[in-house]
């Protein structure tokens, strides 16, 4: 049996402001830092150790991972960064308040943009200042392939090949893996691992900084998955995420 741990970053400044973030490189809030410390403490208490970690190229995931590794006294751990683990690109919604967007377009439309499998938000216009294709962290990504928007299907298409070619060989080699990423990049991986249908994936919400353990068989099929925190904590955290995209009453 193999075991991996998935972790969404702690609360970011735009999580706090209830804004669509996507590839915008925002920082953690003080609460997010404390959430990351709590995740590290929980992993340490439960006896988890790791050989290798993976994360995106966005600071909120990087900082979360570093804080967790510090709590585990494992800052020396090898870490691999890839844009393929980034949050999904939210296109022209990036920077907009979710509740205000829901009030304008309706809760149902925003739910489709946030949680559906194959419907992307409106794309960023050409030349928009929010495009970060010139950023050196994306030097390996051809400009023509740089996303201006993404749906979850697009996120699956970029993450799963990285999982199969980079992460899986290390799992099969017996290395203990921690993946610190984002709500939708983790939803993409979980959809693939658990073979969740396109319609059912709408209801999957990933809370911030809650370690999620996957136990995998010899063929890397899930045996079971579970959060380390208690069920009431997770239910409340998932409900909070689900409510972010609704208009205020």
From Swiss-Prot:
Its EC number is 5.4.2.11. The record marks 182 as: Transition state stabilizer. The keyword Isomerase applies. Substrate binds at residues 8-15, 21-22, 60, 87-90, 98, 114-115, 183-184. Keywords: Gluconeogenesis, Glycolysis, Isomerase. Pathway: Carbohydrate degradation; glycolysis; pyruvate from D-glyceraldehyde 3-phosphate: step 3/5. It comes from the Bacteria. InterPro entries: His_Pase_superF_clade-1, His_PPase_superfam, PG/BPGM_mutase_AS, Phosphogly_mut1. Belongs to the phosphoglycerate mutase family. BPG-dependent PGAM subfamily. Homodimer. PANTHER family: PHOSPHOGLYCERATE MUTASE. This is 2,3-bisphosphoglycerate-dependent phosphoglycerate mutase. It comes from Aromatoleum aromaticum (strain DSM 19018 / LMG 30748 / EbN1). The gene is gpmA.
